[in-house]
């Protein structure tokens, strides 16, 4: 899939960050609170990471008052998990326990597709049937990755209250933001031009042609584009929250 960015992706990240701002406000509604913000989508690694990035940019615009317990550290994201990166539950639990002990809360951004191989392996080892759709894909709604993450970490980090929330329905019903409106306009203008010229293809910025906006050949189009976890902005985000540099997951 050579298309640089799908229409609506930036809006979804914006809206996911807005959703998170309300949900993470619950971090001090109880002692030792674990919040799992689940970003819906089978292969939404980029969206999960971009949502965390936009949320943290929003935090940069806030004013804090540590004297009454209003701190950026407590409002921050403490873990980001995507399908393309290896998941070290034990290592992360050890790190997050220290965060919980220090702040009294832990907030995680989890892609719905993260941890699926581990969940499937655990279900099969227990002799359970893994629910799949007609195409053989694991039914994410049935195995509930967000709840699985919460279950994995809750005891290990001694959480006393757990809150799992999905932002997908909120995000995907939103109107396009200005970035996406501009992107849509540029694509529709070119789409009309190419259609009148009888040139077939999918309109998008072609990453393999220097991000040129063009009609990309149909035979080059495919789904399930993996998120590039080696990008500097993503590695910087993880480093900033104290999470280890990502390693590629075996399934990717």
Model-flagged regions — what are they?
Residues 7-160:
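Accessory alpha-helical/coil subdomains and C-terminal extensions
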Residues 115-252:
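C-terminal non-catalytic interaction/assembly regions of soluble proteins
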Residues 2:
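Conserved small/polar residues in nucleotide/adenosyl-binding loops
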């Amino acid at each position: 899939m050579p298309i640089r960015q799908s229409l609506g992706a930036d809006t979804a990240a914006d809206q996911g960050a807005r959703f998170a701002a309300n949900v993470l406000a619950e971090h001090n509604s109880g002692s030792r609170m674990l919040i799992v913000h689940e970003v819906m989508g089978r292969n939404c690694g980029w969206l999960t990471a971009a949502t965390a990035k936009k949320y943290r940019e929003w935090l940069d615009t806030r004013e804090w008052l540590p004297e009454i317990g209003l701190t950026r550290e407590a409002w921050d994201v403490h873990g980001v998990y995507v399908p393309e990166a290896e998941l070290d539950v034990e290592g992360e639990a050890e790190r997050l326990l220290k965060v919980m002990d220090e702040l009294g809360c832990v907030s995680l951004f989890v892609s719905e597709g993260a941890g699926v191989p581990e969940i499937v392996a655990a279900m099969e080892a227990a002799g359970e049937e893994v629910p799949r759709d007609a195409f053989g894909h694991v039914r994410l709604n049935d195995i509930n990755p967000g709840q699985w993450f919460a279950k994995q970490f809750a005891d290990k980090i001694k959480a006393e209250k757990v809150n799992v929330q999905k932002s997908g329905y909120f995000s995907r019903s939103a109107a396009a933001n200005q970035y996406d409106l501009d992107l849509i306009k540029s694509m529709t203008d070119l789409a009309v031009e190419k259609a009148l010229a009888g040139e077939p293809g999918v309109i998008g910025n072609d990453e393999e042609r220097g991000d040129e906006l063009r009609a990309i050949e149909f035979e080059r189009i495919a789904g399930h584009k993996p998120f590039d976890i080696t990008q500097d902005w993503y590695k910087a985000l993880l480093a900033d929250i104290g999470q280890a540099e990502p390693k590629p997951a075996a399934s990717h």
